[in-house]
């Protein structure tokens, strides 16, 4: 039998406590450290280290003047090395806390736990980590942390400051406390290159918003937000709608378009409203940011959305007399007749300002058609209607504008108005989009968003972006015959022979057989839609050939005559007496005439004549291309004469707008394209009577 006296039992209990949790903070009587067997080894301010020889333990106490009989014991360890190490840490890190406010055992425990887990952290780091942010506002705390190791801007083992830590935790109150009460630096990056704003973005939007508004990293806020949005979209993927509102309000101009585009590409709602009922488009309009507004509009922003005062973005633009924004909004079909809560329409506001906005409003002129509709309708019942779309690269936007206007006047989708649709190059792509039921306004947005990708770099452009776009729109396995009505004709050129031969991609059986000795062509049932569109738009020097096919614009940039001949052969082969009653041919805009001053080539080494020869060669090359791709001159005259001979209604000239400047097929400048669409929109309004007559005929027949 082993007997323990009371002293031995007490020592055993102490050793058991030490072995279980030697760092647990608990209140102990000061009397336990009086008398023999206790040696005060070290004392720094109010932190004292004792050695208990009886139990071979080292005890660290925090002396509290307010409680003279009891005191918190910070640790009780059996290793002298541990005791000396943690005593120094505790003495340094606890002083700012106990100098500021009285501490109890339960509030000390998280502090000392943090000190042991992160010995290189400053007391400001610890205050943020433990949620004791109330200490940050006291002058005594700030004065104590002014030393190098405890500085408010000191960095931990990974380079993070206390502000980094607060932002990373999403602790809005601590962030505000540090920014308002302490001299924190906002431009310090950690060892991974992240600023406090990076950390804020990764965890909570509200913290990031506060940091931005209070000036964190304001000098590079545009770059920072862009980086944060990339992380937020790919990692967090939440609150994107709130981000779009926020970016519209605080982002500086340089990267605003990229920020908006990044959010919208990750399914952010473009028409989200803030507390005052304003959409991002309203906010950007008020700030006069036309380029960013264009980004929103090309991603589906509703130009006619009203705020709480009933104002659309066009109301705001008119009040500001901002010409660029007015053009952008009207081009994207903002209604000039929508009243706000005061009964004011954008047109009325323009008239009241009298500063120039009024002249920008499209005004309908009372023109009359060049033919008598009542007489025509009587004889054209039960006849087919043909839509022809010219080629023109990015100028397909002009076609889309005219088709949208026609669709609005008719009140029906374009595909329901025509029996036949023919197109070349960009017109061929649109023809296929029409028969497959694509929304025209979506196509307008798509053209704007895809142009930089399709026309990236130098000519000839890589085919991958264009083919990716076509596969996405039509599907990789969709066949031409999957949609049978309306019948479609897409022109291309067979360039595996001389002379070249026009080829038509169809969604019906060809009206004639061929005895071609060359490699046989794919039948419509096996022809992929995206490949037909790609073949029709394989413009030489712009894109590589599509196998043996080149752009149809080389032989039929205006496909009207070829389409009419095809329909005639089709009806003849089927012994069908159904005639072609109407042909509507839409152009991509007429370029202005320019004077040519030099055409003669010289056989001379004289520098002057050599320069003239180079200029003449350039002019001749342009003339040759104009002749090959002409769609408005002789082609229109021939088509009109053909229609007159066959008693077919032909409406062309009023639906190919005159452009003030030449627009290249690969133009990507938004300003040039918007001006082109503005001229198209204005032209359509001038020809409103003709457009209404055409729409009435198409709707009624």
Predicted features along the sequence, with ranges:
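Conserved catalytic cores and adjacent C-terminal regulatory segments
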Residues: 3-146, 152-158, 162-181, 186-192, ...
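Short, compositionally biased segments
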Residues: 202-215, 220-258, 355-363
């Amino acid at each position: 039998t082993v007997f323990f006296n009371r002293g031995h039992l007490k020592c055993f209990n102490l050793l058991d406590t030490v072995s279980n949790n030697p760092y647990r903070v608990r209140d102990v009587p000061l009397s336990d450290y009086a008398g023999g067997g206790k040696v005060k080894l070290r004392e720094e301010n109010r932190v004292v280290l004792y050695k208990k020889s009886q139990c071979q333990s080292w005890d660290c106490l925090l002396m509290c003047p307010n409680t003279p009989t009891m005191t918190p014991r910070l640790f009780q360890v059996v290793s002298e090395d541990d005791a000396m190490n943690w005593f120094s840490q505790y003495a340094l890190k606890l002083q700012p806390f106990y100098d500021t406010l009285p501490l109890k055992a339960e509030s000390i425990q998280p502090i000392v736990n943090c000190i042991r887990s992160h010995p290189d952290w400053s007391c400001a780091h610890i205050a943020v980590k433990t949620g004791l942010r109330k200490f940050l506002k006291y002058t005594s705390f700030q004065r104590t942390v002014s030393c190098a190791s405890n500085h408010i801007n000191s960095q931990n083992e990974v380079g993070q400051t206390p502000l980094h830590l607060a932002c990373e935790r999403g602790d809005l109150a601590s962030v505000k406390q540090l920014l308002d009460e302490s001299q924190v630096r906002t431009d310090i990056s950690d060892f991974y290159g992240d600023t406090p704003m990076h950390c804020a973005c990764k965890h909570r939007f509200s913290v990031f918003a506060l940091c931005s508004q209070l000036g964190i990293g304001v000098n590079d806020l545009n770059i920072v937000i862009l980086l944060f949005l990339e992380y937020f979209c790919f990692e967090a993927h939440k609150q994107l709608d709130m981000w779009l509102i926020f970016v519209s309000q605080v982002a500086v101009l340089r990267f605003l378009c990229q920020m908006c585009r990044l959010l919208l590409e990750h399914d952010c709602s473009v028409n989200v409203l803030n507390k005052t009922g304003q959409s991002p488009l309203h906010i950007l309009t008020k700030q006069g940011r036309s380029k960013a507004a264009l980004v929103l509009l090309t991603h589906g922003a509703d130009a006619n959305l009203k705020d709480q005062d009933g104002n659309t973005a066009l109301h705001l633009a008119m009040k500001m007399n901002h010409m660029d924004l007015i053009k952008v909004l009207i081009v994207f079909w903002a209604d000039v007749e929508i009243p706000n809560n005061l009964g004011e329409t954008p047109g009325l506001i323009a008239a009241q300002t009298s500063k120039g906005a009024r002249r920008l409003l499209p005004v309908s002129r009372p023109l009359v058609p060049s033919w008598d509709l009542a007489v025509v309708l009587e004889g054209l019942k039960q006849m087919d209607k043909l839509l022809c779309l010219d080629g023109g690269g990015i100028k397909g936007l002009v076609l889309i504008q005219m088709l949208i206007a026609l669709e609005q006047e008719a009140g029906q989708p374009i595909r329901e108005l025509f029996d036949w649709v023919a197109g070349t190059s960009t017109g061929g792509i649109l023809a296929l989009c029409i028969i497959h039921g694509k929304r025209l306004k979506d196509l307008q947005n798509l053209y704007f968003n895809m142009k930089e990708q399709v026309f990236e770099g130098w000519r000839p452009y890589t085919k991958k972006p264009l083919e990716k776009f076509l596969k996405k729109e039509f599907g990789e396995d969709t066949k031409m015959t999957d949609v049978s009505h309306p019948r479609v004709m897409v022109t291309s050129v067979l360039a595996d022979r001389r002379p070249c031969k026009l080829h038509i991609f169809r969604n019906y059986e060809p009206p004639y057989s061929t005895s071609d000795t060359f490699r046989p062509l794919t039948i419509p049932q096996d022809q992929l839609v995206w490949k037909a569109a790609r073949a029709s738009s394989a413009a030489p020097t712009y894109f590589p050939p599509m196998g043996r096919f080149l752009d149809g614009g080389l032989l039929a940039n205006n496909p009207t005559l070829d389409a009419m001949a095809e329909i005639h052969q089709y009806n003849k082969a089927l012994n069908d007496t159904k005639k072609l009653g109407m042909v509507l041919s839409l152009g991509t805009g007429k370029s202005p005439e320019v004077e040519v001053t030099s055409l003669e080539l010289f056989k001379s080494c004289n520098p002057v004549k050599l320069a003239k020869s180079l200029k003449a060669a350039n002019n001749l090359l342009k003339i040759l291309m104009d002749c090959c791709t002409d769609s408005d001159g002789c082609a229109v005259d021939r088509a009109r004469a053909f229609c007159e001979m066959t008693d077919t209604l032909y409406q062309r000239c009023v639906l190919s707008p005159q452009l003030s400047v030449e627009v290249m097929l690969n133009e990507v400048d938004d300003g040039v394209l918007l001006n082109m669409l503005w001229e198209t929109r204005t032209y359509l309004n001038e020809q409103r009577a003709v457009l209404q007559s055409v729409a009435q005929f198409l709707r009624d027949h």
